[in-house]
Each structure stands twice: as structure tokens, then as C-alpha cells.
């Protein structure tokens, strides 16, 4: 049987080393490395239904096709990454919730906002505890549309994709031991920054590839509706 005296000693060690653990965990998060970082190209094993995207003739149809394509793609290789110093972080599930569109600041393009939500498991170094966290953030991608002077057809230029730092949140699921709460609270900013960067690096190329497969006339129609004030913020 586990002796009370041993339990007291263990608790004392945990409490006494809490500041050290915070520092070590902070270092681990700062040194987070992706196990298999993706290349610039979209992985071929995602099995994206490009034909479904190309068949869309209007933005509502295209939006539904994009959501279906992204949420049914095999993202297995994008869900695991590890770090140095014993920190392991794994994305358990990830879902694209919606697409929101508004005119760009210059009025000549579209800013697409893509809300994401998911859950991850974090293995704390040195104490071997696994905790679950929920993550939500927004990706923003800009699009500009111009008419080709020779063909008279619309052409789409896909601009920068980034995460909205004002819309990132991480929540701890099933808090238990105070020492674990203290450790995670102490590195919440580091975790937020790391997760947003990793998800942005993984998902932005995929999002931009999907947008590039759409018929330009679909996005031209969306822009025309935005200019006419006929489209709500959430599409």
C-alpha cells in the first residue's frame, strides 16, 4: 500500500519543483518541433474531392463542397507533432466550422474567415501526465479578382493566409491536480502561440489549394453580391 509519508514527500517534491517545471515546460514549448513538417505542396494522400469543388456553380454550393472536402479529408499526417524536451502534443480532431466573407479593405477583393475548432492531448514532461485541451481559432485568407483583358474572364489571385491572433482560445478539459493547472496556466501564452502557428502552417496551404480549384466565376459572383450588399457576413 502506498504510505502516507511517501505521499507527503511526493507532494512536497511536486510543489517545491513547480517553478522549475514551469521553466522546463516553457522551454519545451518554445522548442516545439513538427515531427514530419509538410512541404509547400498539399500532401497527395489527403484524397481531396477536387471534382466536387470544380462542379460548384455558385458560392453556397461551393461553400458546402469546401466544408465537406476539408472535413472529410484524411488529415492523419497533420494531426501529430512532437517536441524536444519530452513534450508531446497531438491533435485528436479538427473541424472547419464555417466560412465568413466580407469585402477587403480596398473594396476590390474578399477576406474569407475560416473558424476552426478541435481537441488535443498534451503530455507534460517530467511528470508524465496527459491533459486534454480544446482549441479554437480563425484563419483569414484574402482573395482578389480581376478580369483578364484578353479573355474577358475573371482571374483569382489568392493572397496571404494567416491566423487571427484576436480569435485564438485554448481551454483545459477536466482540470484536476492544482500543480497541473499551475503549470498549464503558466505556459498558456506559449501554447496559444505554438498551436496557432502549427495549425496555420498545416492548414493554410490546404485551404489555398482548395480555393484555387474553384471556378473563378463563383468567386466573382460572391464579390459582386458583397459589393451589392446582398450577402450576409456568415455565408
Curated annotation (Swiss-Prot):
GO terms for molecular function: lipid binding. Its main location: secreted. Disulfide bonds join 161-204. Keywords: Antibiotic, Antimicrobial, Disulfide bond, Secreted, Signal. The keyword Coiled coil does not apply. Residues 1-20 form the signal peptide. It is found in: Secreted. Predominates in the parotid glands, present in smaller amounts (1/10) in the submaxillary glands and in the sublingual glands, and at lower amount in the pancreas but undetectable in the liver. Found also in lacrimal gland. GO terms for biological process: defense response to bacterium. The keyword Signal applies. It comes from the Eukaryota. It holds the Pfam family LBP_BPI_CETP. GO terms for cellular component: extracellular space. PANTHER family: BPI FOLD-CONTAINING FAMILY A MEMBER 2. Has strong antibacterial activity against P.aeruginosa. Belongs to the BPI/LBP/Plunc superfamily. Plunc family. This is BPI fold-containing family A member 2. It comes from Mus musculus. The gene is Bpifa2.
